[in-house]
Amino acid sequence: MKPLVIKLGGVLLDTPAAMENLFTALANYQQNFDRPLVIVHGGGCIVDELMQRLHLPVQKKNGLRVTPSDHIEIITGALAGIANKTLVAQAAKFHLNPVGLCLADGNLTYATQLDPELGHVATVVPKNPALLNNLLGEAFLPIISSIAVDKQGLLMNVNADQAATAIAALIQADLVMLSDVDGVLDANKQRLPELNGAQIEQLIKDNVITDGMVVKVNAALDAAKMLNQGVDIANWKYPEKLTALFAGEIIGTRIKP
């Protein structure tokens, strides 16, 4: 089976019961299926909490966190440290053989600064799959934070959706984006199992897809186009459905290129 990349949204990291449910589902899945799994995560809520504790301002531009050079060490500590090791600890509890990584380890990706006004924020492209392939071949569970390093050796913060897309492209994997939404809903609040780019454009125009959902759907559409395959948006709140999702069933909305 193709590997599966699971992108985890930040709110999950703030919800211990949800994390427990997720890793229970992953453990059940791995007992019954022989499919390599990779987790890619952000952790915006953990970054925000840490910044608040340190009385540092949180500034965003077009939905992306502005990361000046005096903040990148704190953000790296939050994402590659607290968030990553929290997930590794949960996975270890369920005997899932986790290995905590960032996007720079083993030259997995190549990072380029996105916009000088955003500071230490980058986009990444796939580079070298050897480390991941070796880990997956030995039945490890890689858990990858969205911290990268550019060619100058500078730490960079990467949007977790974009990071997950690059990792999925790197190892030719399927991609599932887990967050706190059931998928895309129509005007009658009914879940839409599948959508393509033209349908998404129309739903945004009709104000059916609004606010934060626009960002989620566009990220999934970008990923679907780059990977040339469907990308699922699904909710982590239903542990009983997650095993089916990991096996390829649609429980949320599949965004098609």
Swiss-Prot record:
<comment type="similarity">
    <text>Belongs to the acetylglutamate kinase family. ArgB subfamily.</text>
</comment>
<dbReference type="GO" id="GO:0042450">
    <property type="term" value="P:arginine biosynthetic process via ornithine"/>
</dbReference>
<keyword id="KW-0028">Amino-acid biosynthesis</keyword>
<dbReference type="Pfam" id="PF00696">
    <property type="entry name" value="AA_kinase"/>
</dbReference>
<dbReference type="InterPro" id="IPR036393">
    <property type="entry name" value="AceGlu_kinase-like_sf"/>
</dbReference>
<dbReference type="InterPro" id="IPR001048">
    <property type="entry name" value="Asp/Glu/Uridylate_kinase"/>
</dbReference>
<dbReference type="GO" id="GO:0005524">
    <property type="term" value="F:ATP binding"/>
</dbReference>
<keyword id="KW-0808">Transferase</keyword>
<keyword id="KW-0055">Arginine biosynthesis</keyword>
<dbReference type="InterPro" id="IPR037528">
    <property type="entry name" value="ArgB"/>
</dbReference>
<keyword id="KW-0547">Nucleotide-binding</keyword>
<feature type="site" description="Transition state stabilizer">
    <location>
        <position position="216"/>
    </location>
</feature>
<dbReference type="GO" id="GO:0006526">
    <property type="term" value="P:L-arginine biosynthetic process"/>
</dbReference>
<feature type="binding site">
    <location>
        <position position="157"/>
    </location>
    <ligand>
        <name>substrate</name>
    </ligand>
</feature>
<dbReference type="GO" id="GO:0005737">
    <property type="term" value="C:cytoplasm"/>
</dbReference>
<dbReference type="GO" id="GO:0003991">
    <property type="term" value="F:acetylglutamate kinase activity"/>
</dbReference>
<keyword id="KW-0963">Cytoplasm</keyword>
<dbReference type="InterPro" id="IPR004662">
    <property type="entry name" value="AcgluKinase_fam"/>
</dbReference>
<comment type="function">
    <text>Catalyzes the ATP-dependent phosphorylation of N-acetyl-L-glutamate.</text>
</comment>
<feature type="binding site">
    <location>
        <begin position="43"/>
        <end position="44"/>
    </location>
    <ligand>
        <name>substrate</name>
    </ligand>
</feature>
<protein>
    <recommendedName>
        <fullName>Acetylglutamate kinase</fullName>
        <ecNumber>2.7.2.8</ecNumber>
    </recommendedName>
</protein>
<keyword id="KW-0067">ATP-binding</keyword>
<keyword id="KW-0418">Kinase</keyword>
<feature type="binding site">
    <location>
        <position position="65"/>
    </location>
    <ligand>
        <name>substrate</name>
    </ligand>
</feature>
<feature type="site" description="Transition state stabilizer">
    <location>
        <position position="7"/>
    </location>
</feature>
<comment type="pathway">
    <text>Amino-acid biosynthesis; L-arginine biosynthesis; N(2)-acetyl-L-ornithine from L-glutamate: step 2/4.</text>
</comment>
